[in-house]
């Protein structure tokens, strides 16, 4: 564990309801910057910022439309960079909430994945091989895209599940975790992490970290392997970055 994390006292912020600086009735990143002294006086030395990426907000920001863009209601990417810098000047670390299990149906990846023509994103999400196929026990949506298939959901209709593969494949449209499609999804998540770490954030709290691989073992063998892979990348490239995974315990391989 990182030394700073051992001594961290977190203040959790849902930006929308925290502090509004422009009078639109919605909290924003500038509001967090203005209240850093207040947070410091409370004895907190770390922030956990709930979902703040671009989203249609059908599920409070847990339906991400663009992982590399701050939601306009909260500000801009420049505001995020300013927040990281202002927090660091006061010895406060900042974690962003990352939702890697699914995206919004409005995400550019999903729009490409929904096309009938094979492309880079065809396997970014979990699709059956026919618009009449059920989801092998999982919730699914069919008949809403040009692609001949139904797509698997994680929660609501607006949240198509990203494809990290299956621990046990029971249908021909299911892919093992080491197939090119699932591996590309993992690399895409690493790319998102690098983007924000390079901007100055100190790591991520990961929502529903156990939900990545479908038909996983009881102890989440395959999902844990993905997180060990991502953690190894962080340890190598960003040794001070924190990775806090919700609802999962990574056991030894």
Task: Please state what every model-predicted region is.
Residues 2-187, 198, 209-247:
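Acidic/aromatic-lined carbohydrate-recognition and catalytic surfaces
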Residues 248-253:
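Conserved small/polar residues in nucleotide/adenosyl-binding loops
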Residues 189-201:
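Structured alpha-helical segments in the cores of large, soluble enzyme domains
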């Amino acid at each position: 564990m990182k030394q700073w994390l051992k001594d961290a006292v977190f203040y959790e912020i849902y930006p929308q309801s925290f502090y509004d600086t422009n009078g639109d009735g919605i909290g924003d990143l500038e509001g967090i910057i203005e209240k850093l002294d207040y947070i410091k006086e409370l004895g907190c030395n770390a922030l956990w910022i709930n979902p703040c990426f671009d989203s249609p907000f059908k599920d409070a920001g847990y339906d991400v439309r663009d992982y590399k863009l701050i939601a306009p209601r909260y500000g801009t990417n420049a505001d995020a960079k300013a927040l990281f810098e202002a927090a660091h000047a006061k010895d406060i670390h900042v974690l962003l909430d990352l939702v890697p299990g699914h995206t919004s149906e409005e995400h550019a990846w999903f729009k490409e994945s929904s096309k009938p023509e094979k492309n880079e994103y065809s396997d970014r999400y979990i699709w059956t091989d026919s618009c009449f196929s059920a989801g092998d026990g999982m919730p699914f949506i069919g008949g809403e895209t040009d692609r001949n298939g139904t797509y698997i959901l994680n929660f609501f209709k607006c949240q198509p599940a990203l494809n990290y593969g299956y621990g046990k494949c029971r249908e021909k449209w299911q892919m093992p975790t080491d197939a090119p499609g699932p591996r590309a999804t993992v690399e895409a998540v690493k790319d998102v992490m690098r983007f924000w770490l390079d901007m100055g954030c100190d790591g991520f709290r990961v929502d529903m970290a156990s939900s990545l691989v479908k038909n996983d073992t009881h102890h989440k063998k395959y999902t844990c392997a993905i997180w060990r892979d991502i953690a190894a990348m962080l340890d190598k490239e960003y040794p001070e970055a924190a990775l806090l995974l919700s609802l999962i315990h990574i056991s030894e391989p």
